[in-house]
Every structure is written in C-alpha cells, then in structure tokens.
Amino acid sequence: MWPIFWTAMRTYAPYVTFPVAFVVGAVGYHLEWFIRGTPNTPGEERGIAELREDRKLEELNGRDSTQVLSLKDKLEFTPRAVLERNRAVKS
C-alpha cells in the first residue's frame, strides 16, 4: 500500500503541494495576526513633498519677493561645461 501511495504522491506532487502550502500559509498568516494584534495606526503622516512644500513656503515668507537677482548675475555662476575642465584657461 505504501509504495502505491508514494508513487501517487510523487506523480501528483504539484497538485498536492500547492493546497498544503496554501493551508500552512493561511494558518500562519492568521496566527501571526492573532499573536501580534491589530496594528497601531499612527496619526496622519505627511509626505516628503508636503514637508518640502511647507519648508519652501516658510522660506518665502521671510524675504522680500521683489528683490531678485538679475539674469546677468546668475550667468556668472553657471558651471563650465564638463569637457572644458581640463583645458587651460586663456588669459
């Protein structure tokens, strides 16, 4: 009888293994939730984008929005191209 049983188990292993694994997984899942209990949900967490937006608004509140740099001043601080880094600076 046992050789017939083991031959059938070996032949139909995928059909037997999946339901067994499913039952073991379901029992483990529910047991873990039973032991752990309901999770504590923290208060409303703000995302990184919202925090950044608030920080930027706070920075804007403290300064005069009519005083801005001219485009000529901004052009002086633009980095040189990567390919020109090793070239000698012409006087």
Swiss-Prot record:
Keywords: Membrane, Transmembrane, Transmembrane helix. The chain crosses the membrane at residues 12-34. It holds the Pfam family UPF0767. Its main location: membrane. It is found in: Membrane. InterPro entries: UPF0767 (IPR031933). It is a single-pass membrane protein. One of its GO terms (cellular component) is membrane. Belongs to the SMIM12 family. PANTHER family: SMALL INTEGRAL MEMBRANE PROTEIN 12. This is Small integral membrane protein 12. It comes from Danio rerio (Zebrafish).
